[in-house]
Regions:
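Active-site-proximal helix/loop segments of hydrolytic enzymes
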Residues: 1-165
Length: 165
């Protein structure tokens, strides 16, 4: 997504580029490490002028049946509009059979609660679903998701309801 955004002239700031995280020495427990990581990420997000947060995740469920994308949105202005637009684009292109809808995110999710900017959390699919897990690991599918996320962002910024791609 970062590379595609750059090709379109959209500046992006990554809050994390790998699973490797540098923790302060004082963070000795898992909870302290997670808090430290979350705090550093939210400071970076909230320091950006006119930011839009797109938090990308893969879902997991105890059973293999659930599938499809889902977009959750925060409270700041524009979050619902971006969330609904992104969800519409993802489901129409990748999982048209999905009955999921974009929804407000739980207040329990610190990153989304503390973000002061337009913010969405995108669940790209279920790693617990064997077919989706295979798809989610392919470059082609990752590129499709990235293109749809960027198109949704560009549509949102342009104030358009039509598909950009």
């Amino acid at each position: 997504l970062e590379a595609l955004a750059g090709l379109c002239g959209v500046e992006s700031v990554m809050t994390r580029e790998s699973q490797d995280i540098n923790y302060p020495e004082s963070a000795s427990t898992t909870a302290q490490r997670k808090q430290s990581d979350q705090k550093a990420r939210i400071e970076l997000i909230n320091a950006q002028e006119d930011a839009v947060l797109i938090s990308i995740h893969q879902n997991f469920f105890p059973t293999a049946q659930p599938s499809g994308c889902q977009v959750l949105y925060g409270k700041p202005e524009g979050s619902r509009e971006l969330g609904e637009l992104t969800h519409k684009n993802l489901t129409e292109a990748l999982c048209p059979q999905s009955r999921r809808v974009a929804a407000p995110i739980s207040e329990d999710i610190y990153l989304m609660r503390a973000a002061k900017c337009t913010s969405i959390l995108v669940e790209c699919g279920f790693l617990s679903n064997r077919n989706e897990a295979v798809l989610l690991q392919t470059e082609d599918y990752q590129l499709k998701i990235s293109a749809l996320l960027l198109a949704s962002y560009l549509q949102y910024e342009a104030g358009s309801d039509g598909m950009v791609l």
